Amino acid sequence: FTPSLSPSLIPEPTIKVFSTLFKNEFVGEKEFYLIPSPEIFMKEMIASGSGSIFQISSCFRNSEQLGDVHNPEFTMLEYYTMGFSDKDSISLTHEMIKETAISSPQWLKNDPLVITMEEAMKEYAGVDLIKAQDYGYLKSEAERLNLYVPDKENWEDTFNRIFLTYVEPSLPIDREVYLCDYPSQIECLAKNYPDRPYKKRWEM
């Protein structure tokens, strides 16, 4: 198992964390964080040659809503499979969910929807994500959608306003949805495409 306390964090500015202060009379004080996911340690292991790897671990995220969907402490399965494409990983995730589900709800019987962020922004918000590489266009689209954009707001925050208000609530709930190819402006531990302004990242 990788540590639950970390001196550094994954580059996910939208995730709020729990912090604590380590105190030692010989080495002084240092801030540590309860991990929001084991990603940073697991990717270090992969870089060191571990090969395919998985872990079931306790994770912690601050400022979460309390309920059936969100909780400040939760158990996460994180895995990385060497040689797998995004399509392979999505297929594996779907099969794992089917095999481990206690019941078989209708949404699990329906074929998953795999959609790129570019497609989702266009379909559910009418925003051209290629044109939105220009912040002026992105801001004007947010205003067209009647969203307030504060002065000096950055690209990621304006994008999230549109995504959280129009795209996420519009995604189908009768099947699994896999969002792929996140904008490269959103920092995360994922590779950039060489020919497109997106990162090789997907989320369910």
PLM feature spans:
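Short amphipathic C-terminal alpha-helix that caps PH/PH-like domains
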Residues: 90-100
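Class II aminoacyl-tRNA synthetase-like tRNA-binding/catalytic domains
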Residues: 1-87, 98
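Short intrinsically disordered coil segments
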Residues: 71, 94-95, 194-196
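Cytochrome P450
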Residues: 81-88, 92, 107-116
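Metal-assisted phosphate- and nucleotidyl-transfer catalytic regions
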Residues: 99-204
